[in-house]
C-alpha cells in the first residue's frame, strides 16, 4: 500500500479547515511577539507594524539561516510564492525565525533573499523560545504552517517537503471562496 503523499495530506488539512476570508482575531501565537517584529527597509531592519499580518488565515513560520545551503536554495521559491499571491483575505503570511549566529548574519540573509515579510528581531529570539520549541521541527529549512489559533497544520521535514507545503498553500489561495 502506498503512503499518501504530502500534497494529499495538505489537501485534506485545508479541506477540513473552517476558515473565514480573514481571521476574526489576531494570531494567538504571534500576537504576543508583534512588538518584536522587524522588516527590511532599505539597508536595515526597522520595526514592523501591521494588524492585517496578524489576521492571516495561515501563517508560515520559516526557520532558516544564511549559513544553511538548503535554506539559500529554498528561500527564492518562498519569496516568489509570497510575492505572487493575489491580494485579499486568503493570503498566507510568513514570519522569519532566524537560526543565524548573529544579527549581521540574519540581516545579510534577509537582504540577499529579498524577504519582504517580517522577522523576529535577532535580540528578541530568546524571548520566543516557545515558538522554536513547538514549531521548529528537526532541521532547517523548516516551514510550519499554523492557523490563527496557533494550531500546527503542517510542517516540512526537508527543503523538498517545504516546496510541497508552498505548492499546497498556493493552490489553496487560488481556489474561489465558497459561500
Task: Give residue ranges: language-model regions.
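Conserved redox-active cysteine motifs that mediate thiol-disulfide chemistry
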Residues: 63-80
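Thioredoxin-like thiol-disulfide oxidoreductase module
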Residues: 101-139
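Bacterial N-terminal signal peptides
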Residues: 9-17
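N-proximal helix/coil linker or "cap" segments that precede and/or mark the start of modular domains
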Residues: 16-40
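Bacterial N-terminal signal peptides that target proteins for export
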Residues: 1-8
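Thiol/disulfide oxidoreductase modules built on the thioredoxin-like
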Residues: 125-166
